[in-house]
């Protein structure tokens, strides 16, 4: 089959023989039924059979191949079929595609180990060349500007970042200026509130154009200043210190008097001072007198309604009530426009006593 080499190993013309030689002891026989532990001659004879018997006969299946890649000879015994050159060199297809070096050309006279090592080396070299070529292509592509679909050069991410930095700095500067303007507006508002609003309710911040400001401070009775007829822009100045000294009861009574005021008495601006000033001549009745008058009118109205429901009350009593009401209204001030009311006396008239006369005979 082959002549022995210098090292004592048979030289194989085909690499498939080397592969079969390596895996020969791992392929079992088709008719091996007994275990390998038996040491009989029959078992030894099974493993000493011909090499072609160890591989199943696939000639019939390969003959049905339409491509006709596998060719079998009619006179050859059933065994290994003839293998075409392209399929035999299939494991080394990548190596065949590259230019074959001069040293690896004659492989027929070398041992399988040497040929396999050379094949491994030659198979490993092309990817390195691919990597080198890819690296050169990548470096050249990175150096040259990228072009878009229309031939325009697109900018790299670094250039885009350099261009976006000035935009970001401008936006930050604009935000900083906006924040500074907001702070300035807030400060101006605080100053305006402190000067224009808070100083108006204190005596130190009153308007000097108001002529009665100093006079009101001296002549104020208990709490507030009486606004006089001054310039229209002069506003009443209040003091927080004097607001705490106000008499709430007196303020409530003065409010009730203000509701009844119609303009004939004291002026509307000084409605609260009319009832509080003592020792001065004034024609307006006090608040207590007004309240008592209203109570008397209410009682008279209710009594009149009850008296009308009772029989026996004639026109004389109405006359008495009208006379008493007219006399009472004479004491009322003319400034109050209240409807006239009739006041009836609560005293009841005694019923007439009828004495029986002497009996006639």
Curated annotation (Swiss-Prot):
Gene Ontology MF terms in the entry: dynein complex binding
Biased composition (Low complexity): 321-334
Entry-linked Pfam families: DAAP1
Predominant localisation class: other
Cytoplasm found in the keyword field: yes
Ranges of compositional bias, category Polar residues: 136-157
Subcellular location: Dynein axonemal particle; Cytoplasm
GO CC annotation: cytoplasm; dynein axonemal particle
Residues covered by region (Disordered): 65-191, 309-334
Example GO biological process: outer dynein arm assembly
Iron keyword on record: no
Job of this protein: In cyliated cells, dynein axonemal particle-specific protein required for deployment of ODA to the axoneme. Interacts with outer dynein arm (ODA) subunits.
Protein name: Dynein axonemal assembly factor 8
């Amino acid at each position: 089959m082959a002549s022995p080499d210098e090292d004592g190993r048979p030289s194989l013309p085909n690499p498939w023989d080397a592969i079969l030689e390596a895996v020969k002891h791992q392929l079992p026989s088709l008719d091996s039924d007994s275990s390998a532990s038996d040491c009989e001659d029959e078992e030894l004879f099974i493993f000493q059979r011909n090499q072609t018997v160890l591989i199943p006969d696939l000639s019939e299946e390969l003959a049905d191949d339409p491509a006709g890649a596998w060719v079998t000879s009619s006179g050859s015994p059933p065994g290994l079929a003839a293998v075409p050159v392209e399929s035999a060199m299939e494991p080394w297809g990548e190596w065949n595609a590259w230019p074959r070096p001069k040293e690896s050309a004659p492989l027929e006279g070398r041992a399988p180990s040497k040929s396999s090592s050379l094949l491994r080396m030659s198979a490993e070299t092309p990817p390195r060349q691919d990597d080198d070529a890819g690296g050169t292509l990548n470096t050249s592509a990175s150096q040259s500007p990228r072009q878009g679909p229309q031939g325009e050069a697109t900018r790299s991410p670094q250039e885009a970042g350099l261009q976006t930095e000035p935009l970001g700095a401008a936006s930050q500067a604009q935000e900083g200026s906006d924040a500074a303007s907001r702070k300035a507006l807030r400060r101006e508002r605080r100053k305006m509130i402190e000067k224009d609003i808070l100083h108006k309710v204190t005596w130190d911040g009153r308007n000097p154009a108001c002529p009665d400001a100093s006079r009101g401070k001296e002549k104020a009775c208990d709490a507030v200043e009486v606004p006089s007829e001054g310039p229209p822009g002069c506003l009443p100045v209040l003091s927080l210190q004097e607001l705490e000294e106000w008499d709430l009861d007196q303020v409530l009574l003065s409010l009730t008097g203000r509701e009844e005021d119609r303009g004939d008495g004291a002026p509307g601006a000084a409605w609260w001072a009319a009832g509080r000033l003592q020792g001065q001549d004034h024609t307006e009745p006090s608040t207590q007198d007004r309240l008592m008058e209203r109570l008397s009118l209410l009682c008279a109205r209710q009594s009149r309604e009850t008296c009308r429901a009772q029989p026996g009350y004639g026109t004389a009593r109405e006359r008495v009530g009208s006379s008493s009401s007219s006399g009472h209204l004479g004491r009322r001030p003319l400034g109050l426009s209240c409807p006239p009311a009739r006041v009836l006396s609560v005293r009841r008239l005694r019923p007439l006593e009828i004495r029986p006369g002497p009996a006639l005979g």
